[in-house]
């Protein structure tokens, strides 16, 4: 039986490092819409929804034919935002994919390959690359501390 897969794109206007980052434009199109349009090319996602904290984002999303759900400004991170957004959807999905809203160049084939990898390797819950030494002190890159079995202990900047 085919698994139902939902892509959720968390985005918020109150970015600390770059003010109103989702609204910044590349070739006249907001960054989060570029991300949405690229993710929409996935061959595996059954649905794709933007989870956001501001009506401005909802209105822009509608102009591009994107689905969007308003979430609380109190969400501490993207994971909380997609969880809150998912609770508002009246559909069941087998898998939920977190697609960061500031990835305008995301390759839809990579989305599909990560989903396929996870379906084949059911114990994997987070799939990510290793970090380069020169990026250890960079606050723009999330770091993961894992145990000897590769299980995530915590995430930090």
Where is each model-derived feature located?
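Short, Lys/Arg-enriched, disordered terminal segments
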Residues: 1-4, 120
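N-terminal glycine-rich phosphate-binding loop and ensuing alpha1 helix
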Residues: 4-52
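Hydrophobic/aromatic residues located in beta-strands of well-ordered beta-sheets
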Residues: 7, 48-50, 96, 127, ...
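Short beta-strand segments
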Residues: 10, 98-100, 129-130
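Short glycine-rich anion-binding loops that position phosphate/pyrophosphate groups of nucleotides
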Residues: 13-15, 101-104, 133
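Short, high-confidence coil segments that cap the C-terminus of an alpha-helix
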Residues: 45, 91-93, 121-124
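Short phosphate-binding loop-to-helix
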Residues: 49, 55-116
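Conserved core of the sugar-phosphate nucleotidyltransferase
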Residues: 106-157
């Amino acid at each position: 039986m085919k698994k139902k897969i939902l892509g959720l794109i968390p985005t918020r206007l109150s970015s600390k490092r770059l003010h109103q980052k989702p609204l910044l434009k590349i070739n006249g199109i907001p960054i989060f819409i570029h991300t949405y349009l690229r993710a929409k090319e996935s061959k595996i996602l059954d649905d794709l929804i933007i989870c956001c904290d501001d009506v401005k984002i909802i209105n822009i999303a509608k102009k591009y034919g994107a689905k969007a759900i308003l979430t609380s400004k109190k969400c501490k991170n993207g994971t909380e935002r997609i969880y809150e957004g998912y609770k508002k959807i009246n559909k069941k999905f087998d898998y939920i994919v977190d697609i960061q809203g500031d990835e305008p160049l995301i390759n839809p084939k990579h989305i599909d390959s990560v989903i396929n990898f996870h379906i084949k390797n059911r114990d994997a819950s987070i799939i990510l690359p290793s970090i380069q030494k020169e990026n250890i002190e960079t606050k723009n890159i999330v770091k993961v501390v894992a145990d000897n079995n590769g299980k995530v202990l915590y995430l930090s900047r």
